Amino acid sequence: EAQRLRGPLANEVKDAIAHAYDYDRNLTFILTGSEVGLLHELLNVDNEESPLYGRYYHEVTLGRFSVNESEEFLRRGFSELSISVGDDVITSIAEYFDGIPGWLTLAGNVYARTRDLSQVRETAIKIAMSEIENLIRVKERTSPIVARRYETVLRCIANGSNSWGRVLRCLEDEEGSTISSSVLHNIITNLEKLSIIKDYEFLDPIYREASKRLKRHSQ
């Protein structure tokens, strides 16, 4: 998962892949990630300074399923596990995870083990929270202030601030001071590059729920 390769580890992994690409035969690396922008940023194959510059790769994009496709996906999965699950449960899972294949796979496996829808949701939110906190930790290496502002912007958008003005107002209210447009622009742009948000909306409903739980920090 590309989300786990933020920070110094990313360069080590890219160096290892580049070495294997040059010297090893019949070896394939598969990198996955729900944050498409982060995956592209990690590979960075168009940057001459990247260890993977110029290396061939093939990209497979798996889009969201429709509600019907999600339900059929879950039914087949439960059938393979020889588990009987009611249509109401299948519909609930399909609607909650909004057709995202990775979450549907996780949800099906967790429900098969626990038979508890609330546990399914909590497990997914905890995973999303862990990935968001990892992003914040990376930002904290640059500046605790920057990290705090990322948290605030994510929480503001998760709680309904769906325009530039509303996000800026929410950020300034929490900071207790005026924030320059360039600061917010950089944060929004980076979150969009990571495929976390677009047009002040979360692309992934689970990330939205996780971001609502981000804690406020005292100044």
Q: Which sequence ranges carry the predicted segments?
A:
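Conserved Walker B catalytic segment
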Residues: 1-37, 44
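Helix-loop-helix "sensor" segment of P-loop NTPases
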Residues: 42-95
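Amphipathic alpha-helical "lid/sensor" segments that cap RecA-like P-loop NTPase cores
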Residues: 75-137
